[in-house]
């Protein structure tokens, strides 16, 4: 492709810029006239059409027979002006330009450009649209809803359009934002439930495959398919669990102010299933509604009873009715209240049966001696009549309670009530908290109760009279048949109640439970159908762990009884690491890796790096005990081998109790303290374990300027910051450090652990460091043949002062043969250099290497230990491919509160390979915040890089 680079200076002076854009169809190679460097403008780059002020247009007439050329300002390189042939570009409109410009990878951008259908659909994606998001290549797409559409940074003539998406369902917790970008709130969602992505990562969910619209439709949702209105008095049915309930239509219309949501239907049910009083937002829509037998639902959830096939749905509903809380799929059946005179008469209905568990539900003050609800299960000996709560006198008694059908998954007298609509909150397009269409009907009933905005409420202190010692984070149970087990996440007294409640996160889902909200206010956050609010006095310490209650000591708590659900295996048989696909299948997933507990991440991540996919240090696990070893040598070695390393390699998981055993052993060392509770550094752990307990042969032997050899287990890079260097490689850092300190390896190491240059945990010398996949240490070894930097022959002299000379192999250690050394130092600027002879084996004749191939000593990167804000994580390589990387976090998730459990996780991160293929210049210019997935932590937060020698590990 022919093109010319006009200038690297700003072009605003000689040119007019027009809002016309072109996309390059071929790669363009041009020369910078200032630096004479070859620049590449890849296929898929976008340029803005510029107009020559003097000529009046930028289509430069070419020689006869040649096509015109177009002047473009490349948007990714705003100071570069190119002139390209018309045949090598295609004009694109501004809206497409904005969508494509957000895709930083030109190859992926060009691929999307060719998919015109998908690109056109991108114009339709707006706030409120249901989408699928591709977070990582090769993985499944997660469902979500667009909450933001627009540029992230409006700093250019034209900016790329990004989409802020709230991830739903299985995608929750897989994101990286709560809607904030560079300190600016662009939308609102829960932490780590949002992402900002370009169009290439999005797929608009069509009508046929959406399962989200009815609960997540935006105000301008064009996907909503409306059914024709149903006639008043027509018979209809709806599905409740596994059964069909019937009723008569008394209302069918759109809701005032919510017309875009489509038709809603009010149904007078044959059985007492209902919650609607005929009002919406204070407007009386229907005068025939009986609160306890009338229900308001979206028309998509109604089955017209036109024939005997009423059991078949008119069309597949957008969301299964069960998912809105009518019942629990785990229930075998649903018992319905009998339509007796006492229950069918509204005046005789028991209004106290239901104190709410659900967000937006209500309470009544009339206690009933024979009705005991799960919500208020008090002490076993307590009078059931006292088990119902009292509410404040200002409660609007004219607002009837919601009375859904009970579910028989609980005992007969203590049924859990589940409402036949969703009360799940969802952020509106403006970021405020709204409700799905089906929750709007409940809102009208509860408008008196839900006047307070939904917000995170701080936990209130537990009253001192609590005899059980329960607190936030305690494992508790609620006596039922069967009992409920969970972790107390909140304790306090909600407004309008004179009872202290406990909010529990249950172990298992239960119909009727929420995600942490009570009466419209959020007190904590958990998975849907897992939050239960009960009287605090109804709670008891979890009887399954009676010996551990109450527990305040996190060290003593870390035992096999408390961690009963997280225990790992003991494996006696020596097990080499499984690599490639086999290792991947064993290791990836949640509850994989090493479980973290109580500031153990430094130790978890270090052990995972050293042993998960490398056997270079397996000799540490096998050396027999010697006379001079400490008394707990065998105990430590056996623990490491059979309870940590072998189970990790076979099952991919190690419980925190095993690590606590090791931490207690580390505490026995006289020079050590705080290993069971405090945050430590990996180097401190390695020093105590390797030197004081296992007496491991030092991994490194280093000599400084001919002095005595020094032994160590890892090498810390010390150096001053070089402002000229953008992104250094590990190879460069190691060579710089050795040259400046005049160091050499006395022996080739089998394992090389390099600590990155930084001042403390927080201050990094470089914003990014490129982890060299292969490390050539040949020039850093003493008594080793080395190549002349000029002719490739046997080097006899090394010159440290030539190291920074850019004219001779810039950035390389300078060693020369006799002839080349003389020639190099004849130059006037090198006349005063002091060079030294290279240390060579004494029995090595010069001529044996003069024309031969001098072997290199290379080491392979097998793991990187990273730290960010005092939390250590690990990257390990499980195969030969550059993309064969796994990311490990010992505390990736949490089960329960303060006395809960960390859930470790290992995830593949193939995106790392793409960044390791980038040039250092491209990596330097790349905004760290734009680095996808886990790769940012690898490139920006490296703390230790671990290398192994495939050959030397056979001998050491």
UniProtKB/Swiss-Prot annotation:
Zn(2+) 2 binds at residues 799, 802, 825, 833. GO terms for biological process: innate immune response; negative regulation of canonical NF-kappaB signal transduction; negative regulation of canonical Wnt signaling pathway; negative regulation of inflammatory response; negative regulation of interleukin-18-mediated signaling pathway; negative regulation of JNK cascade; negative regulation of NF-kappaB transcription factor activity; negative regulation of non-canonical NF-kappaB signal transduction. This is Ubiquitin carboxyl-terminal hydrolase CYLD. The gene is CYLD. Residues 394-469 are annotated as: Interaction with TRAF2. It comes from Pongo abelii (Sumatran orangutan). It is found in: Cytoplasm; Cytoplasm, Perinuclear region; Cytoplasm, Cytoskeleton; Cell membrane. It is an enzyme of class 3 (hydrolase). Residues 330-349 have a biased composition (Polar residues).
């Amino acid at each position: 492709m022919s093109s010319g680079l006009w200038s690297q200076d700003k072009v605003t002076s000689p040119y007019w810029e027009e809002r016309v854009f072109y996309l390059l169809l071929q790669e363009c190679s041009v020369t910078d006239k200032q630096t004479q460097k070859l620049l590449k403008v890849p296929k898929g780059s976008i340029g803005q059409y510029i107009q020559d002020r003097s000529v009046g247009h930028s289509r430069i007439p070419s020689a006869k027979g040649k096509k015109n050329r177009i002047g473009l300002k490349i948007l990714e390189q705003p100071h570069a002006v190119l002139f390209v042939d018309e045949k090598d570009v295609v004009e694109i409109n501004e809206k497409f330009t904005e969508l494509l410009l957000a895709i930083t990878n030109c190859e992926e951008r060009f691929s999307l450009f060719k998919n015109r259908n998908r690109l056109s659909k991108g114009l339709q994606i707006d706030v409120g649209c249901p989408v699928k998001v591709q977070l990582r290549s090769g993985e499944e797409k997660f469902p979500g809803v667009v909450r933001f559409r627009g540029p992230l940074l409006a700093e250019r003539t034209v900016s790329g359009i990004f989409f802020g998406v709230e991830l739903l369902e299985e995608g929750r917790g897989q994101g990286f934002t709560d809607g904030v970008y560079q300190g600016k709130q662009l939308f609102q969602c829960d932490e780590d439930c949002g992402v900002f992505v370009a169009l290439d990562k999005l797929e608009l969910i069509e009508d046929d495959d959406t399962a989200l619209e009815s609960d997540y439709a935006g105000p301008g949702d064009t996907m909503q398919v409306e059914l024709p209105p149903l006639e008043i008095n027509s018979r209809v049915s709806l599905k409740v669990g596994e059964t069909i309930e019937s009723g008569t239509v008394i209302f069918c219309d759109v809701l005032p102010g919510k017309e875009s949501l489509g038709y809603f239907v009010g149904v007078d049910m044959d059985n007492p299933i209902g919650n609607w009083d005929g009002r919406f937002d204070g407007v009386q829509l229907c005068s025939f509604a009986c609160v306890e037998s009338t229900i308001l639902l979206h028309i998509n959830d109604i089955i017209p009873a036109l024939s005997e096939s009423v059991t078949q749905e008119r069309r597949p509903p957008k969301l299964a009715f069960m998912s809105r809380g009518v019942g629990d799929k785990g229930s075998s059946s649903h018992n319905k209240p009998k339509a007796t005179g006492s229950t069918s008469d509204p005046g005789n209905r028991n209004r106290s049966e239901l104190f709410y568990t659900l967000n937006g539900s209500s309470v009544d003050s009339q206690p009933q001696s024979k009705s005991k609800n799960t919500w208020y299960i008090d002490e076993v000996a307590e009078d059931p009549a006292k088990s119902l709560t009292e509410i404040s006198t200002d409660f609007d008694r004219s607002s009837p309670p919601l009375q859904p059908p009970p579910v028989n998954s609980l005992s007969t007298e203590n049924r859990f009530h589940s409402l036949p609509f969703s009360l799940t909150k969802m952020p509106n397009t403006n970021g405020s908290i709204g409700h799905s269409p089906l929750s709007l009907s409940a809102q009208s009933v509860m408008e008196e109760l839900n006047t307070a905005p939904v917000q995170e409420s701080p936990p209130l202190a537990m009253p001192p009279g609590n005899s059980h010692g329960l607190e936030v984070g305690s494992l508790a149970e609620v006596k039922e048949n069967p009992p409920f087990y969970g972790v107390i996440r909140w304790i306090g007294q909600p407004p309008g109640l004179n009872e202290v409640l406990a909010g529990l996160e249950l172990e298992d889902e239960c119909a009727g439970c929420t995600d942490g909200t009570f009466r419209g206010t959020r007190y904590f956050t958990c998975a849907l159908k897992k939050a239960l609010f009960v009287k605090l006095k109804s709670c008891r310490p979890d009887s399954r762990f009676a010996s551990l209650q109450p527990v305040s000591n996190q060290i003593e708590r870390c035992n096999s009884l408390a961690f009963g659900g997280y225990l790992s295996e003991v494996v006696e048989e020596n097990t080499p690491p499984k690599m490639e696909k086999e290792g991947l299948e064993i290791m990836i997933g949640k509850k994989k890796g090493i479980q973290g507990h109580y500031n153990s991440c430094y130790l978890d991540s270090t052990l995972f790096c050293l042993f998960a996919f490398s056997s270079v240090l397996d000799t540490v696990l096998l050396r027999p005990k010697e006379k001079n070893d400490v008394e707990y040598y065998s105990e430590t070695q056996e623990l490491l081998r059979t309870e940590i390393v072998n189970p990790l390699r076979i099952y991919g998981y190690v419980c925190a109790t095993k690590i606590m055993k090791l931490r207690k052993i580390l505490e026995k060392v006289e020079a050590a303290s705080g290993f069971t509770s405090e945050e430590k550094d990996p180097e401190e752990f390695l020093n105590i374990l390797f030197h004081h307990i296992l007496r491991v042969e030092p991994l490194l032997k280093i000599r400084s300027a001919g002095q005595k050899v020094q032994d160590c287990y890892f090498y810390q890079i010390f150096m001053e910051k070089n402002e000229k260097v953008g992104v250094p490689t590990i190879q460069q850092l190691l060579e710089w450090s050795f040259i400046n300190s005049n160091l050499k390896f006395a022996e080739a190491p089998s394992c090389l652990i390099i600590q990155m240059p930084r001042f403390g945990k927080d201050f990094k010398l470089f914003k990014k460091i490129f982890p060299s996949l292969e490390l050539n240490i040949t020039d850093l070894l003493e008594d080793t043949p080395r190549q002349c930097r000029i002719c490739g022959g046997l080097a006899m002299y090394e010159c440290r002062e030539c190291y920074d000379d850019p004219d001779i192999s810039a950035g390389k250690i300078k060693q020369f043969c006799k002839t080349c050394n003389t020639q190099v130092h004849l130059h006037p600027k090198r006349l005063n250099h002091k060079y030294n002879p290279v240390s060579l084996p004494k029995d090595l004749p010069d001529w044996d290497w003069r024309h031969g191939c001098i072997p290199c000593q290379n080491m392979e990167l097998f793991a990187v230990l990273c730290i960010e804000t005092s939390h250590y994580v690990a990257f390990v390589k499980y195969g030969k491919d550059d993309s064969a990387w796994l990311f490990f976090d010992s505390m990736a998730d949490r089960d329960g509160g303060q006395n809960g459990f960390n859930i470790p996780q290992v995830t593949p991160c193939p995106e790392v390979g793409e960044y390791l293929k980038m040039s250092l210049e491209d990596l330097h210019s790349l905004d760290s915040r734009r680095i996808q997935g886990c790769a940012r932590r690898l490139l920006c937060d490296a703390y230790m890089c671990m290398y192994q020698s495939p050959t030397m590990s056979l001998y050491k």
